[in-house]
């Protein structure tokens, strides 16, 4: 199995881990202990009711909201990277630079998620988070460029 495919699996695993370890544990611990009802988690209010949302923010400084957003960032970017991997596989492209770009992309994704969840949204934290997001975008654009060059040859 090549590195971009392994990174894709790692990206998917990280997305699921973020869901289960952060959002899932948080929600289910409150439901199982009877602090909220299952109906509290409505689809039109991702963090629960307005009253409950204010209580959460007061208790956790928005940790749950940041975890939810970090998970959604993973979900939003996973298909983009998956499309790149499909194109790489279809064209049979493999190189050390592609492998390194893939690994850097996943490392940047993991750090961006951790910064997003663990640090309150200050200018410094947001800039740091954006830097790791930008690193991912650069890696994916570079891999896309390699694919485009191979197509044009």
Q: How should each PLM-predicted stretch be described?
A:
Residues 1-47:
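N-terminal signal-anchor transmembrane alpha helix
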Residues 13, 71, 103-107, 131, ...:
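Hydrophobic residues within alpha-helical transmembrane segments
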Residues 14-22, 80, 108, 112, ...:
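Alpha-helical transmembrane segments of multipass membrane proteins
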Residues 48-79:
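Membrane interfacial helix-start motif at the N-side
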Residues 72-87, 140:
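Core segments of transmembrane alpha-helices
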Residues 84-107:
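Short alpha-helical packing/oligomerization segments
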Residues 111-139:
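Interfacial loop-to-transmembrane junctions
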Residues 143-153:
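Juxtamembrane boundary at the C-terminal end of a transmembrane helix
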């Amino acid at each position: 199995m090549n590195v971009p495919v392994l990174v894709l699996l790692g990206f998917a695993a990280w997305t699921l881990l973020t869901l289960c370890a952060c959002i899932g544990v948080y929600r289910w611990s409150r439901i199982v202990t009877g602090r909220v009802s299952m109906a509290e988690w409505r689809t039109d209010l991702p963090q629960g009711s307005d009253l409950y949302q204010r209580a959460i923010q007061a208790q956790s400084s928005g940790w749950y909201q940041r975890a939810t957003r970090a998970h959604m960032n993973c979900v939003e970017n996973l298909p983009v990277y998956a499309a790149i991997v499909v194109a790489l596989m279809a064209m049979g492209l493999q190189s050390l630079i592609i492998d390194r770009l893939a690994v850097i992309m996943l490392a940047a994704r993991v750090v961006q998620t951790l910064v997003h969840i663990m640090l309150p949204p200050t200018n410094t934290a947001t800039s740091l988070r954006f830097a790791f997001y930008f690193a991912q975008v650069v890696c994916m654009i570079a891999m896309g460029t390699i694919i485009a060059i191979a197509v044009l040859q």
